[in-house]
């Protein structure tokens, strides 16, 4: 009886699709734009090889903004999946 209750509560897993990738990319762009305006020392050492290509960010700022973007993106993807939109 307990097993049937667990099976009834199980959700369908979300498969990766280009829509999921696009949501993660958009979330990363938003996070980088947010980081560009709020990080106090965006060009802290160690520097990236072509800092102009990365918006003048150093390695710590780039890692921080992309990590934040992935957190935002995963939250958006899981929320939209829970709502049944994707």
From Swiss-Prot:
**Is Transmembrane helix set as a keyword in this record?**
yes
The record's GO CC annotations read: photosystem I; plasma membrane-derived thylakoid membrane
User: Where in or outside the cell is it found?
Assistant: Cellular thylakoid membrane
Annotated GO biological process: photosynthesis
Q: How does it sit in the membrane?
A: Multi-pass membrane protein
Q: Which domain of life is it from?
A: Bacteria
Task: Identify its protein family.
Answer: Belongs to the PsaG/PsaK family.
- What is the name of this protein? Photosystem I reaction center subunit PsaK
């Amino acid at each position: 009886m307990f097993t049937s209750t667990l099976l009834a509560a199980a959700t369908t897993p979300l498969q990766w699709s280009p829509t999921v990738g696009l949501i993660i990319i958009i979330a990363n762009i938003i996070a980088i734009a947010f980081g560009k305006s709020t990080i106090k020392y965006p060009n802290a050492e160690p520097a990236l090889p072509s800092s102009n290509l990365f918006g003048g960010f150093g390695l710590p700022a780039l890692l921080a903004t992309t990590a934040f973007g992935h957190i935002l993106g995963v939250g958006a993807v899981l929320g939209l999946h829970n709502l049944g939109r994707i």
